[in-house]
């Protein structure tokens, strides 16, 4: 995952 990856956003 890349930094700042947010699947909950």
Swiss-Prot record:
GO biological process: defense response
Places the protein is found: Secreted
Tissue specificity note: Expressed by the skin glands.
Protein name (Swiss-Prot/TrEMBL): [Thr6]-bradykinin
4-hydroxyproline found at: 3
Biological role: Thr6-bradykinin: Induces relaxation of rat smooth muscle from tail artery and contraction of that from ileum, urinary bladder and uterus. Binds to both bradykinin receptor B1 (BDKRB1) and B2 (BDKRB2). [Hyp3,Thr6]-bradykinin: May produce in vitro relaxation of rat arterial smooth muscle and constriction of intestinal smooth muscle. May target bradykinin receptors (BDKRB).
GO cellular-component term (any): extracellular region
Annotated GO MF terms: toxin activity
RNA-binding is among the record's keywords: no
Family: Belongs to the bradykinin-related peptide family.
